[in-house]
Amino acid sequence: MCGALMERYVAAMVLSAAGDALGYFNGKWEFLQNGEKIHRQLAQLGGLDAIDVERWRVSDDTVMHLATAEALLEAGKVSDLTHLYSLLAKHYQDCMGDMDGRAPGGASVQNAMLLEPDKADGWRIPFNSHEGGCGAAMRAMCIGLRFPHSSQLDSLIQVSIESGRMTHHHPTGYLGALVSALFTAYAVNGKPPQQWGRGLMEVLPEAKKYIVQSGFFVEQNLQHWSYFQDQWEKYLKLRGIWDGKSAPTFPKPFDVKERDQFYSSVSYSGWGGSSGHDAPMIAYDAILAAGDSWKELAHRAFFHGGDSDSTAAIAGCWWGVMYGFKGVSPSNYEKLEYRNRLEETARALYSLR
């Protein structure tokens, strides 16, 4: 099992980046807000299995996910989380030098440059009511690879929140990072996906408790807390998985057009997956429906009219943890940009866990 789990760690990092590259298509598909057009173009390319990602660059999502992973590795088994936070801030700032042609989000760019990693608490930024975007969620999955054990839940909560609010200091933003990390840990532990949402609902009070204990912009955070929780509660009830036991139910038909409409309906501003609540939600919806099919996952999470590279990066990671490279066309990842770096960080995270 150990060797198999290491392989799944590798798949998690690599397929997250592969999903990102596929959903991004050098910017063409991230910003094409019509899923049916994307699926037509995909068919013209010969379908998913025919795509060779050699010239398909990864976006800001993977660059920042690698920054998170490499900061976790540099910190090692350190128990002082403030040291880790300074390293995260440094890596987030440094990775901004690798954003040419990768369409980085505004909040990530602006706030990364405000960070002062060498100063005490220089990794903190003020609360901002406009920072509910998905930039925190898209880079946090590997935190669940580093802290997968139930005994490490407090660390997972704290690190995902603080990594998130270095650039997205708003609950809708940084709680997205918590979901990305938490569901990765669930996947490592073989928890059935229909139980994940219920697990999140049980963890959110712990997250709120941490926000209060941290004593940093507590009032503002609590004032804006309910949107994220309400949206997830509504979604879990819609899919019939509020109890954490039932199988999810999907409407019929639920094809490309219907999915675009649904993704837009759960979004904050109409662009599905562009916020911290709905990027992991759309990824989760795809995981619930796709089972062990990489192609079905891609059709739902990578190729749609919303913020497709972010939902793809998150979904690709969770799916990779569960299924490894099962049924994935090698052309989708063999010549992937940064593949060696992704594999090295995955193996090192496995050793560190």
Curated annotation (Swiss-Prot):
**Reactions catalysed, as given in the entry:** N(omega)-(ADP-D-ribosyl)-L-arginyl-[protein] + H2O = ADP-D-ribose + L-arginyl-[protein]; alpha-NAD(+) + H2O = ADP-D-ribose + nicotinamide + H(+)
Q: Kindly list the cofactors needed.
A: Mg(2+)
Enzyme Commission number(s): 3.2.2.19
| Keywords (A to Z) from UniProt | Hydrolase, Magnesium, Metal-binding
Q: Which GO terms describe its biological process?
A: protein de-ADP-ribosylation; protein modification process
Residue ranges of the region described as Substrate: 106-108, 168-170, 268-270, 274-275
Which Pfam families does the UniProt record give?
ADP_ribosyl_GH
Which superkingdom heads the taxonomic lineage of this protein's source?
Answer: Eukaryota
Q: Name one GO molecular function term.
A: ADP-ribosylarginine hydrolase activity
Kindly report, in one word, the top-level EC class recorded for this enzyme: hydrolase
Q: How is the cofactor bound?
A: Binds 2 magnesium ions per subunit.
| Binding-site residues, substrate | 90, 129, 135
Which InterPro entries would you find in this protein's record?
A: ADP-ribosylarg_hydro (IPR012108), ADP-ribosylglycohydrolase (IPR050792), Ribosyl_crysJ1 (IPR005502), Ribosyl_crysJ1_sf (IPR036705)
Q: Which SUPFAM superfamilies match?
A: ADP-ribosylglycohydrolase
Where does this protein hold Mg(2+) 1? 59-61, 309
Query: Which function does this protein serve?
Result: Specifically acts as an arginine mono-ADP-ribosylhydrolase by mediating the removal of mono-ADP-ribose attached to arginine residues on proteins.
Q: How does it assemble?
A: Monomer.
Q: What is this protein called?
A: ADP-ribosylhydrolase ARH1
Q: Which species expresses this protein natively? A: Bos taurus
Q: What gene name is listed for this protein?
A: ADPRH
